[in-house]
Amino acid sequence: MIDEAVQQLLDGFVTSVREVAAVQAVWLHGSLALGDYQLGRSDLDVIVVTSAPPPAAVADVHRRLIRDSPLARKLHCSYMTELTDQSVRHPTFAQERYFDRPVTPVTRRELAIGNRTLFGPTPAELLPATTDEELFAFVRRDLRDFWLPATRKRTNWYADIWVDLSLLTLARAHVTLATGDLITKRAALDVLPGLGAPTSVVDDIRARRYGPVPRTWPWWRHRRGVLARRFTSTAIPAVLS
């Protein structure tokens, strides 16, 4: 069940975006679709399917929602007019800015698994299926071409988001490549010890996502970043082998 405040935000978003764009469907993916949503911590991942390119006014919709509700800062939305070609970059509002990005095979598989619609037909009715080959190729490419090179840079690893995403992405990739399944972030935390991840870093991620947020001292940020970077750099080749 979706939290009442989140449901109100999503309902308001659907109403507002339908007033300015030719909306065919509005879908949920990510933690909202897979049952791992954490209020105030998780993003609100949304796809809007439109029959024509979205007008500039959709950015105004997002900015107005942000002014009215702090939760709206977490609302990330891509606007899709082309559902078949996975290489197409779609207008997206996320992190309080407007840019273009593809809807990845992982997102497409999440949409299919959750099959959650806020308006219009479900993903199963409109979205072409993502094959395991497409999913595996993307997961391998993401580890090889993005995360492995990122381990050669030191500065990013002091940020919470880099520590969290690196380890969680790695664990989820390991399971996907081994079984074809997509798992939640909560499940990924349980996988990490078996991959040799530092226990202190796993506990840190778990506390910040699911428990009382701990105070983070500068020395720990440095130590945590070193541990996360070192683990990621050695674990990726093993997962890809």
Name each region found by the language model.
Residues 35-38, 85-90, 213:
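Short, solvent-exposed polar/charged micro-motifs at secondary-structure junctions
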Residues 1-5, 59-160, 167, 173:
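Conserved NTP/Mg2+-binding pocket subregion across the NTase superfamily
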Residues 125-241:
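Nucleotidyltransferase catalytic cores
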Residues 19-22, 40, 71:
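Short, structurally constrained coil/turn elements
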Residues 28-65, 74-81:
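Catalytic metal-binding acidic patch
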Residues 1-27, 56-58, 241:
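Helical scaffold of the NTase/Pol beta-like nucleotidyltransferase catalytic core
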